[in-house]
């Protein structure tokens, strides 16, 4: 294997979703010689300073430097944090995820991916599909991809859960070519 992506759960994150992410991401990245490993989680209490009591949300950017330290400890190509709490960025009501290509880290939140959040019945399969799309999207950013105008491409920007459900979990041909170029070059 040429490298490794680590998945870092932060707080209470469902094990079945983490296992699905690890298996699915492994299946995709194995052809590039990249192993995907689930590592020991972090306590959410480490991030109390990121919590906005009025909004009842965590400011996503505060997770990224900590993930960067963990990524370096594992000598990994990238680190993906997974939380089960609501996250936001300044100027936005909420976000599904956030990436920092310079630090080679990203975070995704499951909070708004649950069908129950929208008043629909629980659907574990749908939750896992949404989580995979967000993981592929944020890792795409980590590896140098921008947002894509193709609504079916996983790199398409999701303004709402409807956008997430419309897109596939895979990169379009154009984004995939760019990703492959980046993975075999500067990000190795």
Swiss-Prot record:
Query: What is the protein name given in its UniProt record?
Result: Archaemetzincin
Write the gene name: amzA
Q: Could you say which cofactors this protein requires? A: Zn(2+)
The Gene Ontology terms for molecular function here are: metallopeptidase activity; zinc ion binding
Described by its record, this protein's role is as follows: Probable zinc metalloprotease whose natural substrate is unknown.
Upper taxonomic lineage: Archaea, Methanobacteriati, Methanobacteriota, Thermococci, Thermococcales
Question: Which residues does the entry assign to the active site, renumbered to this chain?
Answer: 138
Q: How is the cofactor bound?
A: Binds 2 Zn(2+) ions per subunit. One is catalytic, whereas the other seems to have a structural role.
CDD domains on file: Peptidase_M54 (cd11375)
